[in-house]
């Protein structure tokens, strides 16, 4: 069953969502883009979709018509609108992917005329907050405004779920070492956050994040037990979660790492990250052996059955942030960064804060439509 979607906002996440639909067969087979809404001309949007300074050149064919207000990718045409008010957009779709960052309250998101609205940001009064692979079972048919949380919440939540299910977390504190975003200034300028007002490429910028507190909406038994902060750093993409926590049950470094290995090895599209094999295989790049075990196109063995499929992976090599650009996983746990000192434990995980989150938006869109 094809899902008809509209994308509101063609910034970093909106363009990532659009690109993923046409770049990954698993999505292009199931999702039809009916319309997008953005503030630029058709020519400008087409150019920014085609050429991306972080993710590289899009390999597909892109066309546009300025006077008729449409874009076309790989021969599939869709409408381009330039409306500021959601109620003025004639979507005619099943699901809206709200990627502007401007409509982060339920009363605002509900103004879209669609069965489902999935917001790419925390929405305190959303019908539900879904972190794909972690609390999918909380999604109900009647939920209309669905928050996908944030890129950081999507990294932290799978880690917390693995740890909490085995060790029972008592409390925790997260620091996200985060790439700069368009919410910061290239050079010093106006911003309500005086630190984000400063030049993003020249300093580490301490700032805020609600990612840790959002976990309480995703894993209710941890409500009020986690908090966190953020430091924006001078890189254009890929971030890291540094999570320190205490637990009811004691564990060694080796035991904690084994938990993540078991979780990742049970994922339906797991690939161990190595220096020799730093290539991210989308969900569709799989085949079945005669025994029924899935294999990647490179021959990497995978197993079935774990609910965090396609969201959790591990890394045991000494990699750096740029090695994870365009990585599809929500969290790649760096096993070399696990520590235990007395009652305090620490784990770290990488995430492509643009690409992986864009994919999770689409995963939730497919999941929500299956509930209709």
Functional labels for PLM-detected ranges:
Residues 1-197, 339, 361-363, 371:
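N-terminal Rossmann-like NAD(P) cofactor-binding subdomain of oxidoreductases
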Residues 2, 228, 240-265, 304-372:
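C-terminal active-site/capping subdomain that shapes the small-molecule cofactor and substrate pocket
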Residues 4, 8, 12-19, 63, ...:
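Active-site-lining helix/loop region of Rossmann-like oxidoreductase modules
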Residues 10, 101, 151, 207, ...:
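Structured loop/turn residues at secondary-structure junctions
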Residues 34, 79-81, 227, 312-315:
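General small-molecule cofactor/ligand-binding pocket signal
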Residues 150, 154, 202, 351, ...:
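Short, conserved micro-motifs enriched in small and acidic residues
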Residues 269-283, 287, 294, 301-304:
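A cross-taxon signal for low-complexity, glycine/charged-rich
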Residues 288-290, 318:
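Short linear/disordered segments characteristic of secreted peptide precursors
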């Amino acid at each position: 069953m094809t899902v008809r979607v509209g994308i509101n906002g063609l910034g970093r996440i909106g363009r990532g969502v659009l690109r993923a639909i046409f770049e990954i067969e698993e999505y292009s087979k199931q999702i039809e883009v009916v319309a997008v809404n953005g503030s630029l001309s058709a020519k400008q949007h087409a150019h920014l979709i085609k050429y991306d300074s972080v993710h590289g050149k899009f390999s597909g064919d892109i066309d546009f018509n300025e006077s008729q207000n449409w874009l076309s990718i790989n021969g599939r045409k869709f409408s381009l609108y330039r409306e500021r008010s959601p109620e003025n957009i004639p979507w005619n779709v099943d699901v809206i992917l709200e990627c502007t960052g401007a409509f982060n309250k339920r009363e605002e998101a509900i103004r879209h005329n669609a069965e489902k609205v999935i917001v790419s940001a925390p929405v305190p009064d959303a019908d539900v907050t879904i972190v794909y692979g972690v609390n999918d079972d909380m999604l109900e048919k009647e939920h209309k405004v669905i928050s996908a949380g944030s890129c950081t919440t999507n990294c932290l939540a799978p880690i917390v779920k693995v740890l909490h299910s085995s060790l029972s977390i008592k409390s925790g504190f997260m620091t996200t070492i985060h790439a700069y975003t368009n919410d910061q200034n290239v050079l010093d300028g106006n911003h309500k956050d005086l630190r984000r007002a400063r030049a993003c490429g020249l300093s580490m910028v301490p700032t805020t994040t609600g990612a840790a507190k959002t976990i309480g909406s995703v894993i209710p038994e941890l409500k009020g037990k986690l908090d966190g902060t953020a430091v924006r750093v001078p890189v254009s993409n890929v971030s890291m979660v540094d999570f320190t926590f205490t637990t009811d049950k004691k564990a060694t470094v080796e035991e904690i790492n084994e938990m993540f290995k078991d979780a990742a090895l049970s994922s339906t599209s797991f690939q161990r990250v190595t220096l020799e094999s730093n290539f991210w295989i989308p969900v569709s790049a799989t085949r079945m052996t005669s025994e029924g075990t899935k294999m990647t196109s490179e021959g990497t063995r995978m197993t079935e059955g774990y609910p965090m499929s396609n969201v959790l992976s591990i890394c045991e090599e000494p990699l750096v942030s740029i090695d994870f650009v365009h990585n599809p996983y929500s969290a790649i746990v760096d096993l070399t960064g696990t520590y235990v000192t007395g009652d305090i434990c620490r784990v770290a995980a990488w995430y492509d804060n643009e690409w992986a989150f864009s994919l999770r938006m689409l995963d939730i869109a497919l999941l929500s439509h299956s509930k209709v």
